[in-house]
């Protein structure tokens, strides 16, 4: 029988717990797939067949040793601002909807989500479902297709995850269970306390109290830990702490920043800081303009804050400037919107590249890619072949600059400004090495290349989970 992991709130660790359970089951020889009916995130991933899903479900698929598919996250909401989100349905753009209108769509979306869930059950047998946000959002019970409505339809065991680091864990757990609709309360079969710091023995009486209050077994207390797993959403940026390393990289924290998981390998070898629009860019060795859900609006915000002048000043000082996806579009001369990405009009770009971009349709390019870096730059020259994925609206006229990658991107004559549509570029060790080696050498510092073949983080996660959680009790839930 499948099971469902729900939370007392957002950011309690549901995604990671699902990934841990998936890897633990796979290591026992049990085939399992992850599923989240509805996710809201600007960090997304492109499946092999060109569908877009949340990065968390891709991560969970990897934990289950599967290739991600669109059925694992049939509904993805990508916030655009002004209480409006783009709805991605079964991997492809469905429509932009205000929140009030979205709830009119939930019966149809739930039907599609249940069909996707059914296909996963048919193929894999076992499915670990992840809820969204807090399970006890009482004002949404009649339309919450990620928690209550879904749980009522599926009727499968629920495991509740709570974050003790925030404080108030007793109220979190007790309140969530008591506020669940009466038919769902008996489905709560276990509780996991996550992000514990210190000696767990101190919390032994806390476990007893929670079990007495709720009548539900505490399956385990998971310590606070750090593993190189992809971040799910913008809440995670606030948790990032840059390392005290000699090379500093500024990633512009655009208002609608997306796919900042692109830089998580760099974070291990450089002081990567997410600098908000208006923040100082002085003293950085490299500036990266990342992807964004709203290129034109974020370019306007960047300009209003004066960050455009800081970027242009850094360029004059010989600081590398790199644009990824929407950041690549911003680096160009012009952006023309026919009313599909933002308000219709023509907007000047930063002018660091000669390219120009037009948003002429609502369609989106989504595909996995393999590219060869052009040996025309002191940074690109040693990258070689790299892989990644594209998720973007708009078509770019490349202009007169040199090609940066085979079939993608542009680079200036001196090689210090380049843009690409390729998300995941710097998750390639060769690409991260190429950039870091250049930056370290420029400061006359020795750089040691990234060592590949390190321990699988999902196995490390599973080992930690097994150490602190009663995994046999979870397996028993599946067997009922």
Swiss-Prot record:
It comes from the Archaea. Keywords: Cobalamin biosynthesis, Glutamine amidotransferase. The active site is at residues 325, 423. Transmembrane segments: none annotated. Residues 246-431 form the GATase cobBQ-type domain. GO terms for biological process: cobalamin biosynthetic process. Belongs to the CobB/CobQ family. CobQ subfamily. Catalyzes amidations at positions B, D, E, and G on adenosylcobyrinic A,C-diamide. NH(2) groups are provided by glutamine, and one molecule of ATP is hydrogenolyzed for each amidation. This is Probable cobyric acid synthase. It comes from Methanoregula boonei (strain DSM 21154 / JCM 14090 / 6A8).
């Amino acid at each position: 029988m499948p099971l469902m992991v729900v939370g007392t709130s957002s950011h309690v660790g549901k995604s990671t717990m699902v990934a841990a359970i998936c890897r633990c089951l796979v290591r026992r020889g049990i085939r399992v797939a992850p599923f989240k009916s509805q996710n809201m995130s600007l960090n997304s991933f492109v499946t092999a067949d060109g569908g877009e899903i949340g990065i968390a479900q891709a991560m969970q698929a990897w934990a289950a040793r599967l290739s991600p598919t669109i059925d694992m996250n049939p509904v993805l909401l990508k916030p655009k601002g002004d209480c409006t989100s783009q709805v991605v349905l079964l991997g492809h753009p469905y429509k932009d909807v205000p929140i009030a209108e979205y709830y009119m769509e939930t019966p149809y979306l739930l039907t599609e989500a249940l069909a996707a869930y059914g296909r996963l059950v048919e193929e894999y047998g076992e499915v670990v479902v992840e809820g969204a946000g807090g399970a006890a959002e009482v004002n949404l019970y009649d339309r919450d297709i990620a928690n209550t409505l879904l749980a009522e339809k599926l009727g499968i065991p629920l495991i509740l995850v709570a974050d003790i680091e925030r404080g108030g864990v007793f109220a979190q757990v007790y309140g969530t269970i008591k506020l669940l609709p009466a038919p769902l309360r008996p489905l709560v079969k276990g509780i996991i306390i996550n992000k514990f710091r210190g000696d767990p023995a101190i919390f032994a009486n806390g476990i007893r109290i929670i079990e007495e209050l709720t009548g539900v077994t505490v399956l385990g207390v998971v310590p606070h830990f750090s593993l190189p797993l992809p971040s799910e959403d913008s809440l995670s940026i606030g948790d990032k702490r840059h390392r005290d390393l000699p090379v500093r990289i500024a990633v512009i924290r655009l208002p609608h920043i997306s796919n900042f998981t692109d830089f998580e390998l760099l974070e291990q070898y450089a002081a990567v800081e997410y600098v908000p629009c208006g923040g100082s860019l002085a003293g950085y060795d490299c500036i990266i303009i990342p992807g964004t859900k709203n290129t034109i609006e974020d370019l306007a915000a960047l300009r209003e804050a004066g960050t455009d002048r800081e970027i242009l000043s850094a360029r004059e000082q010989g600081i590398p400037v790199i644009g990824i996806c929407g950041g690549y579009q911003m680096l160009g001369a012009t952006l023309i919107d026919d009313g599909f990405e933002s308000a219709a009009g023509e907007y000047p770009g930063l002018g660091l590249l000669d390219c120009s971009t037009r948003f002429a349709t609502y369609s989106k390019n989504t595909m996995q890619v393999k590219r060869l870096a052009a040996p025309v730059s002191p940074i690109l020259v040693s990258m070689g072949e790299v892989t990644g994925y594209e998720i973007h609206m708009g078509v770019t006229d490349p202009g007169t600059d040199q090609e940066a990658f085979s079939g993608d991107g542009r680079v200036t004559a001196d090689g210090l400004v380049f843009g690409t549509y390729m998300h995941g570029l710097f998750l390639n060790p060769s690409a991260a090495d190429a950039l870091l080696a250049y930056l370290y050498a420029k400061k006359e510092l020795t750089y040691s290349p990234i060592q590949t073949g390190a321990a699988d983080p999902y196995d490390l996660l599973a080992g930690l989970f097994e150490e602190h959680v009663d995994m046999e009790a979870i397996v028993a839930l599946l067997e009922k």
